Amino acid sequence: MPTTGPASIPDDTLEKHTLRSETSTYNLTVGDTGSGLIVFFPGFPGSIVGAHYTLQSNGNYKFDQMLLTAQNLPASYNYCRLVSRSLTVRSSTLPGGVYALNGTINAVTFQGSLSELTDVSYNGLMSATANINDKIGNVLVGEGVTVLSLPTSYDLGYVRLGDPIPAIGLDPKMVATCDSSDRPRVYTITAADDYQFSSQYQPGGVTITLFSANIDAITSLSVGGELVFRTSVHGLVLGATIYLIGFDGTTVITRAVAANTGLTTGTDNLMPFNLVIPTNEITQPITSIKLEIVTSKSGGQAGDQMLWSARGSLAVTIHGGNYPGALRPVTLVAYERVATGSVVTVAGVSNFELIPNPELAKNLVTEYGRFDPGAMNYTKLILSERDRLGIKTVWPTREYTDFREYFMEVADLNSPLKIAGAFGFKDIIRAIRRIAVPVVSTLFPPAAPLAHAIGEGVDYLLGDEAQAASGTARAASGKARAASGRIRQLTLAADKGYEVVANLFQVPQNPVVDGILASPGVLRGAHNLDCVLREGATLFPVVITTVEDAMTPKALNSKMFAVIEGVREDLQPPSQRGSFIRTLSGHRVYGYAPDGVLPLETGRDYTVVPIDDVWDDSIMLSKDPIPPIVGNSGNLAIAYMDVFRPKVPIHVAMTGALNACGEIEKVSFRSTKLATAHRLGLKLAGPGAFDVNTGPNWATFIKRFPHNPRDWDRLPYLNLPYLPPNAGRQYHLAMAASEFKETPELESAVRAMEAAANVDPLFQSALSVFMWLEENGIVTDMANFALSDPNAHRMRNFLANAPQAGSKSQRAKYGTAGYGVEARGPTPEEAQREKDTRISKKMETMGIYFATPEWVALNGHRGPSPGQLKYWQNTREIPDPNEDYLDYVHAEKSRLASEEQILRAATSIYGAPGQAEPPQAFIDEVAKVYEINHGRGPNQEQMKDLLLTAMEMKHRNPRRALPKPKPKPNAPTQRPPGRLGRWIRTVSDEDLE
């Protein structure tokens, strides 16, 4: 994203550079015709951004100015690479006397060069391309358009900027300019073979254009070549001039290459060309070149014949002209019907990788770019599908602003693609992500860690292919394994001398991806399957610790394990294979450390494997180097698997140590195991205060354990509301980074503590305090507090001053609850029910009796909407929850306006009081407006029409009221008759008679 700042291109061009964002801001004045054209070079690697032209009254464009970056890059930097660029064109400034923004914009991106365009008129631009993602039309100038630079090539080198270099010579002020010689563009122009010129002598000579050709140049160029002339006329003199012509048709540069060159008869006369035009002389884009020949005769008289013939060619070399983005594509933005004198603003940002010149390098730190083949390959794949993904080169500015979040989501390889899913692009992007990483892992073996870290939709197996490509094969040589319905992915490998051909197969509903890996190394056996489908399994958490010695745990974590029927060592990580324990019936449980006998009687063998996640009918295997487990934490899950033999994974984790007597013993580290279950969206079942309290014996467990747990709500650990926002992520990273280890000594120590607690009440109390600290997650806090209070003085003072049971402070804090039982706030469910009841009571006070608490809960915990209220008022039927009834909200209700209301409105509109009454025709017009508006008065547009109608009727009505005479300034004001007092009335003539 250009507006988010510069970033290094993640390719393998590793040169130390600095990143810089350069702004471009121009206020362009609109010409007399109100039309103009802005030419952008969105991919040009340098300071040039574009050029502005105004349309003249004769229909031709006139050059106004070049558009550049704010800083002149060649003055401080030697080499450059363009990373990204975006430019916005809009108008928000009005000249005096103009009160509204007028005008529209057409914009198009043309994949060729500027000189190749044949129609650059406002409407003709839209025919330059048929790609709808490269053109937009009739955008209001107030909204504006945004031009986006999309890469046309990758893995590009740095471009020399044409920086000045001091020259050594007689004049120390002379400088040399080092231009880019990388990828020049060469135009070869050939004159017609044996071109024949014939004319009569004229004073001042006869001028002809020998040739004219289209070229494109905005940087330095050179012209080289030669022409050969032959003549049979004595005294002929030739002059040759080369013109470089701009886009507007005016001459930008003129160079005389021959002046008064005499021709010798009967021989070849050579005229060589060798011109160099520096960048600073090219003041506007060049689009054509012309060679003119002036023919004259020494001592010629009127009527003398002048004859010659010519042949030859020349070449125009544009330095760096074929560098991708330098001259093509171009984006043209044309505006039309904008008020004269208005200001069109061009603003944007260009992001560069720059290598400073030696002077600046003394004070500027440079760094190498980041080589990320995955990101580079992903970018190529995304932009190759840009038409399908809706990525355009020109945008309405408001639409581009709205799409920025979509671009940011697509750029993040780990994003869940929510916005892309809303636009229907999710499947395309996910397919691209699946393709991008195998190519990275195959072609770039050192990037194997990247393949493991890509995230959603990428299989960990691809990283193993990268290891195989680098010489450590991860597939068994010559052992073909067929894909089955249970296995989502597997590796099939065959040894062919020094090559290993590996194919990644998937089940029929997924595509097949093939990859060829070359390896001279020795093959080692490994399967590395990551997911098992439709496999019955039971789950149980195991506490895993990192220890400093046999009795000092350093950190506690927990891992979820699955019990699968049969011998399935191929699903285990290499660290667990070959290790098993026998049960009382002689069967084996693989994945356990060979420590004694498991106190269970089973009817078959089982395998215990670590897992990372569980889905509806599949489990995701873990590749962490987990050692064989010890202890009896998995006895309950193994027993359940042996009795019920489920066909799908049971979505409830089990905990508890089942002994030979059928009793379920409580386990320690309750909060750690709960966190592990919740992280996978599972509930924890076992004896005690777990999510499901199954009781202390096997019979109670069978009755209370849910046999259809797949219908339970999943509460992902990462989204639990009572945790800090980043707690789930930190827990996940901690588990991924921990060094797992569990020892038999730790299990023995736990059992020894439980035995001591049964004998010593004081130790039982101490153990209860420890479990209380562990369950509430404050073990570390208490340990830190103990270090700061070695003699327990602060703790004694705290306990001595603690409120006693029944005290005033105790009742104020805990209410009527017992000591130590702190009053709690309502649960989310209770708070939601209280809110529903509160809304229902409020509706009841307003006379809306159908909004019961149950109805409010079904309506999304909100009161009735306007549509629901209208429906209930009109039909007196209870509206359905979550139905908006929009027809009742927006339906127009007809009502008739009274004649008095219409007459009053007509009189008010037709004229002021005291003037003539409105004619019946005008009253009828007002009545029509009221009828159209269903009884409402006229709106603004209708009021304008009625005022115009009244004005016309007044002018053609001979009986219209005469205008009132203006009062004379010297006329005495007449005192209006009125009351002389409260009890005195005026005497009239009748009273006198």
Curated annotation (Swiss-Prot):
Comp. bias regions, Basic residues: 956-967
Catalytic residue positions: 633 (nucleophile), 673
Modified how: Specific enzymatic cleavages yield mature proteins. The capsid assembly seems to be regulated by polyprotein processing. The protease VP4 cleaves itself off the polyprotein, thus releasing pre-VP2 and VP3 within the infected cell. During capsid assembly, the C-terminus of pre-VP2 is further processed by VP4, giving rise to VP2, the external capsid protein and three small peptides that all stay closely associated with the capsid.
UniProt xrefs under Pfam families: Birna_VP2 (PF01766), Birna_VP3 (PF01767), Birna_VP4 (PF01768)
Keywords, alphabetical: Capsid protein, Host cytoplasm, Hydrolase, Metal-binding, Protease, Serine protease, Virion
Domain Peptidase S50: 494-736
InterPro entries: Birna_VP2 (IPR002662), Birna_VP3 (IPR002663), Birna_VP3_dom1 (IPR043048), Birna_VP3_dom2 (IPR043049), Birna_VP4_Prtase_dom (IPR025775), Viral_coat (IPR029053)
A GO CC annotation given for this chain: viral capsid
Site (Cleavage): 422-423, 468-469, 475-476, 482-483, 493-494, 736-737
Hydrolase among keywords: yes
Region Interaction with VP1 protein, annotated ranges: 984-993
GO biological process: proteolysis
Chain positions covered by the region annotation Disordered: 950-993
Enzyme category, top tier: hydrolase
Transmembrane segments: none
Enzyme Commission no: 3.4.21.-
Sequence positions that bind a divalent metal cation: 11
MF term (GO), any: structural molecule activity
Origin superkingdom: Viruses
Summary of the function given for this chain in its UniProt record: Capsid protein VP2 self assembles to form an icosahedral capsid with a T=13 symmetry, about 70 nm in diameter, and consisting of 260 VP2 trimers. The capsid encapsulates the genomic dsRNA. VP2 is also involved in attachment and entry into the host cell by interacting with host ITGA4/ITGB1. The precursor of VP2 plays an important role in capsid assembly. First, pre-VP2 and VP2 oligomers assemble to form a procapsid. Then, the pre-VP2 intermediates may be processed into VP2 proteins by proteolytic cleavage mediated by VP4 to obtain the mature virion. The final capsid is composed of pentamers and hexamers but VP2 has a natural tendency to assemble into all-pentameric structures. Therefore pre-VP2 may be required to allow formation of the hexameric structures.
Stated name of the protein: Structural polyprotein
Naturally occurring in which organism (per UniProt): Avian infectious bursal disease virus (strain PBG-98) (IBDV)
Organism taxonomic ancestry: Viruses, Riboviria, Orthornavirae, Birnaviridae, Avibirnavirus
